[in-house]
């Protein structure tokens, strides 16, 4: 089962936290679609800022958005202009006051989303899929990961029949719930069509906090 299920979804409530934190009854579907729009807009507007994830927290008339990025300078902009423009647009989109927090990702090579996007970018620049994966694996292991697995699927090298090739190093224990495994997928647009990129990174074991253990009783 651990091989098929989404590694992050499987660990939510155990060692991972929710990326959207709010409660709603009748408005649940509306707020869910609003979250999707917010995340899509941020991904599009900040596509060159190496954004890993967006956390959304809602209060009565306020929305707190936390952006995890490897390039905080690009998100903030000169004199804070970019982040202010982003805040204004998101305020119009949600109809509420928006507060934006920016958290810098210190080690981008240990973030599955950034590693997957980096491989996808290289594939778009016609780098060999084998070379792109092997270089990413070397950088991630050098950064301190316990294990990594990458997979590229599609018309590899312009072949007529689509296939998938994966490489791995170290261990990636997908069944161990206390294992801190980061997972992400990305897409590369090539002349032969789309290629899918998947990345699993094992960063070591995390013991559940006392709070989460008590909550599960």
From Swiss-Prot:
> What keywords are annotated for this sequence in UniProt?
Ribonucleoprotein, Ribosomal protein, RNA-binding, rRNA-binding
Protein's name according to its UniProt entry? Small ribosomal subunit protein uS3
Q: Which family does it belong to?
A: Belongs to the universal ribosomal protein uS3 family.
Keyword set includes rRNA-binding: yes
Domain (KH type-2) spans 38-106
GO cellular component terms, alphabetically, are: cytosolic small ribosomal subunit
Question: A biological process (GO) annotation for this entry?
Answer: translation
Does this UniProt record's set of keywords contain Ribonucleoprotein? yes
Looking up Pfam families in the UniProt record yields: KH_2, Ribosomal_S3_C
Q: Which organism is it from?
A: Lysinibacillus sphaericus (strain C3-41)
Q: Which HAMAP family match?
A: Ribosomal_uS3_B
User: How does the annotation summarize its subunit structure?
Assistant: Part of the 30S ribosomal subunit. Forms a tight complex with proteins S10 and S14.
Domain of life, per the record?
Bacteria
Q: Its Gene Ontology molecular function terms? A: mRNA binding; rRNA binding; structural constituent of ribosome
What does the UniProt function comment say about this protein?
Answer: Binds the lower part of the 30S subunit head. Binds mRNA in the 70S ribosome, positioning it for translation.
Annotated NCBIfam families: rpsC_bact
Tell me which PROSITE patterns the record gives: KH_TYPE_2, RIBOSOMAL_S3
